[in-house]
Design a protein with these regions (language model features):
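C-terminal output helix
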Residues: 89-91, 105, 109-118, 164, ...
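Receiver (REC) domain active-site loop signature in two-component systems and cognate sites
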Residues: 60
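Active-site beta3 strand of CheY-like receiver
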Residues: 10, 49-55
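Recognition helix of helix-turn-helix DNA-binding domains
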Residues: 161-194
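Acidic catalytic/metal-coordinating carboxylates
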Residues: 37-38, 64-67
Length: 213
């Protein structure tokens, strides 16, 4: 089995010298780099599934990096984006962060600041993907619950005791305990705290939906 690939940094800048210099710097910390001179080609062809960070120049011929950033966010791209500019202003910085940038750095770029931003971005992306997978798994398990089990889950998340749940469902506490045990097994929850953490937001989301949605 081949070892997993290191995170991939997408470097988008129309200046060949800048790309070459930054690519060399980034590779020194074990990160892979893919260079792009054309932002349009990048948007069309980059790997959206892999772990990594996007480094995007603000000023490029024909299109602003801020426009590219807005397009990426609109398409649901989840890789963190580090913006670079040689002509930064407070307004430009504000617009970049408002559009979804993870970091905004001025050229000439401080090596340590850039590497720190990339390493933070990679950690952020890994955690984001892990949360997404946990949420996806939780939804899949929830879909296999019976109506009764979903009712029990909602009452657990609401903080009811076994006795209170028994009264609400018109069943004995022992029946509630059996339902809880089955629920914990089906949802692969190791503790009450884990169960609530994984499913509270989902229960709230589903409760807010109109009937039949």
């Amino acid at each position: 089995m081949s070892p997993p690939l290191s995170p991939l940094i997408h470097l988008i800048d129309d200046d060949d010298a800048v790309r070459s210099s930054l690519s060399l710097l980034i590779s020194t910390v074990g990160l892979r780099v893919q260079e792009w001179a054309d932002p349009h080609a990048f948007v069309r062809g980059f790997d959206r599934d892999g772990i990594g960070v996007i480094v995007l120049d603000v000023r490029m011929p024909g299109i602003s990096g801020l426009t590219v950033l807005a397009d990426l966010m609109a398409q649901g791209v989840d890789q963190p984006v580090v913006m670079l500019t040689g002509h930064g202003t407070v307004d430009m910085c504000r617009r970049a962060f408002k559009a979804g940038a993870a970091e905004f750095l001025e050229k000439p770029v401080d090596d340590e600041l850039l590497l720190e931003a990339l390493q933070n971005g990679v950690r952020q992306h890994v955690k984001s993907r892990e949360r997404t997978q946990i949420d996806r798994d939780a939804r899949a398990r929830y879909a296999h619950l019976s109506e009764r089990e979903r009712e029990v889950l909602s009452l657990i998340v609401a903080g009811l005791t076994n006795k209170e749940m028994g009264r609400a469902m018109d069943v004995s506490p022992r029946t509630v305990e059996a339902h809880r045990a089955n629920l914990f097994a089906k949802l692969e929850a190791e503790s009450l705290a884990q169960l609530v953490r994984r499913y509270a937001a989902l229960i709230d989301e589903l409760s807010a939906q109109p009937p039949g949605a």
